[in-house]
């Protein structure tokens, strides 16, 4: 009798669990997947990882994982915007708003932004319509417009260049776009800032481990200091050590982009530093975390605050604060490389 009661009890439990499971599943299945609204802030032209990261974003948008609201640029050369527009057009998104700054920082065209002017038989190899610098709006205007039109606490910003644009945004007053100041607008609209900047481990150099003053920081130290000190939402930093340990396999450049006779990502990579060079994926890691923060691609430090020193060194202090930095295991590294290659090389769907 005891055995019969136990069996009956178990049967009722299983049946109840099944009913509960059946009742919850349709609700979960019907819940729409909301693409993550992304703003991409980049110094495109100074290194090729920016270009691969932009290609990633377009692949993620096709998959329904994100929606690119705007691209703002911190490299002060007009070809940076033209090449960005050419890449966006290649992926069928030539209408994405693009904004620039006039900072005087890295004014050279760079090794591959010249692809924006490359012609074959008199026609642009990579068509685009952003050719006159006078028609390109200021980055702060583009940022304020994108944020003002977004839902509250929804936008993720992937900053993979200097902090110039976002520091200027914080200091912007209310205007016809929004009565809110830049800092108020960020606090109301931004969910997360995922940024490639700084270094949170010592870096190997000539057989020694040394402090590293990272490029994106040192090119505009005051802006980086402002951002670290005043940004009002959570920040996750992808330090120099992360991308350094996740190299993009050059075999992918040689083999995975051949579905078209000319590919802006592959050609930019080759012009910057051709195979057999495996380029670190600094900027791509920030984009991957921005869109997939809960997929386990990376671990996180404890919460705290980041301070940017006068010489560009970044230091992290655990405790109260909304800032963390990425950490990476060997097992995660393998998975991250696979994700970055698959996304960067995904053919456009126009």
Can you annotate each of these PLM segments?
Residues 26-350:
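N-terminal acidic, glycine/proline-rich low-complexity segments
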Residues 9-20:
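Bacterial N-terminal signal peptides
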Residues 1-10:
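Positively charged n-region of N-terminal signal peptides that target proteins for export
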């Amino acid at each position: 009798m005891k055995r019969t009661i136990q069996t009956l009890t178990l049967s009722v439990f299983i049946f109840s669990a099944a009913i509960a499971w059946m009742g919850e599943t349709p609700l979960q299945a019907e819940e729409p997947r909301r693409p993550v609204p992304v703003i991409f802030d980049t110094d495109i032209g100074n290194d090729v990882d920016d270009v691969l990261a932009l290609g990633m974003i377009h692949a993620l948008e096709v998959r329904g994982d994100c929606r690119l609201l705007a691209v703002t640029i911190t490299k002060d050369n007009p070809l940076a915007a033209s090449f960005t527009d050419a890449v966006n057009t290649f992926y069928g998104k030539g209408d994405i708003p693009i904004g620039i700054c006039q900072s005087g920082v890295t004014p050279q065209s760079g090794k591959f932004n010249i692809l924006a002017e490359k012609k074959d038989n008199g026609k642009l190899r990579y068509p685009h319509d952003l050719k006159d610098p006078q028609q390109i709006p200021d980055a702060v205007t583009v940022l304020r417009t994108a944020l003002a039109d977004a839902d509250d606490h929804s936008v993720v910003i992937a900053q993979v260049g200097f902090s110039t644009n976002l520091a200027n945004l914080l200091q912007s007053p209310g205007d016809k776009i929004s009565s809110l100041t830049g800092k108020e607008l960020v606090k109301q609209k931004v969910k997360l800032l995922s940024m490639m900047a700084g270094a949170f481990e010592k870096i190997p150099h000539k057989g020694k481990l040394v402090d590293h003053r990272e490029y994106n920081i040192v090119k505009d130290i005051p802006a980086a200091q402002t951002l670290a000190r005043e940004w009002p939402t959570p920040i996750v930093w992808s330090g120099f050590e992360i991308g350094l340990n996740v190299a993009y396999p050059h075999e992918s450049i040689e083999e995975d982009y051949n579905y078209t006779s000319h590919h802006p990502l592959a050609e930019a990579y080759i012009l910057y530093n051709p195979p057999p060079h495996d380029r670190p994926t600094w900027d791509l890691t920030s984009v991957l975390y921005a869109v997939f923060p809960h997929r386990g691609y990376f671990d996180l430090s404890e919460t705290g605050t980041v301070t940017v020193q006068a010489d560009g060194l970044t230091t992290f202090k655990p405790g109260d604060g909304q800032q963390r930095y990425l950490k990476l295991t060997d097992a995660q590294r393998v998975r991250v490389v696979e994700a970055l290659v698959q996304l960067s090389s995904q053919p456009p769907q126009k």
